[in-house]
Amino acid sequence: MRDLHKKKPRPVTQNRLKKPPKTCKPINYRGILKKTAKVVGGAALISAVGCAGYGIYRIIAGTTFFKLERIEVSELKTLKRQEIIDLAGVREGDGMFGLRLRSIGEQIGKNPWVSRVEVRRYLPNTLSMQIAERQPVAVINMGYLYYLDANGDVFKPLTEGDQLDYPVITGISEEDIARDPAGSKGALKEVLELIAHLKSRADFKLDEVSEIHYDKGYGVTLFTAAAGVPVKLGSGDYSRKLDRLARIYKELQTQISVLEYIDLDYSDKIIVKKV
């Protein structure tokens, strides 16, 4: 009979192969030191080259061979040569490598007459400054008088000595420009196109106009140089309207002192209103 109380023999587990213990590699201090030495040496070399380069720069900058001797300024219409040199803040004897061209250009560009400036250095001793000046084509009255250039940009308040021999534009204020810059710029360009057309005419020329008034709701009204008679043009089609005026203007000149206005803003007629 089986002995139920007899313990069963435990199965023998298969012996696992034991891995040999890992052996720690010795630290290669010599390799680490070599790499560290290379990094430190490279940094030292870069630093030394930088210091040497700066030293060479100082020597070159200080040598009399690279001193400013010639200052070239492009031909000017309004500004004076010495004004540009004073704005640039340079003088003969300055070190050529110490000239900061961008800063010089920015200083010159602060003058309202300057629209564009180009500054160049030519070794061993020349500084060149090419200046493009703004040219006024009209005066705009916004409480104060300002010059207006061909792009429709208001660029300078008039001061004592400035010329006034330009057509005067009215009807556009500083508040208009601040509130609606794009619309105001468009209106000014429209007026400038009319001025350009008047300049090109052989009859009823720009000289016969003293003021050009712009009204956002109506358009353009001219005022004659003689007696200040309003000439209502409205908006657009200026060439045809002025052609019609030119045909009768010589006759009207004899009685211009009694005219209240001339209205050209019609397609088929001209209205001449007397006082």
UniProtKB/Swiss-Prot annotation:
Subcellular location: Cell inner membrane
Leader sequence residues: none
GO cellular component annotations of the record: cell division site; plasma membrane
Cytoplasmic-side positions: 1-38
Annotated keywords: Cell cycle, Cell division, Cell inner membrane, Cell membrane, Membrane, Transmembrane, Transmembrane helix
Stretches of the chain found on the membrane's Periplasmic side: 62-275
Cytoplasm is among the record's keywords: no
Entry function: Essential cell division protein.
Protein name (record): Cell division protein FtsQ
Organism: Geotalea daltonii (strain DSM 22248 / JCM 15807 / FRC-32) (Geobacter daltonii)
Gene: ftsQ
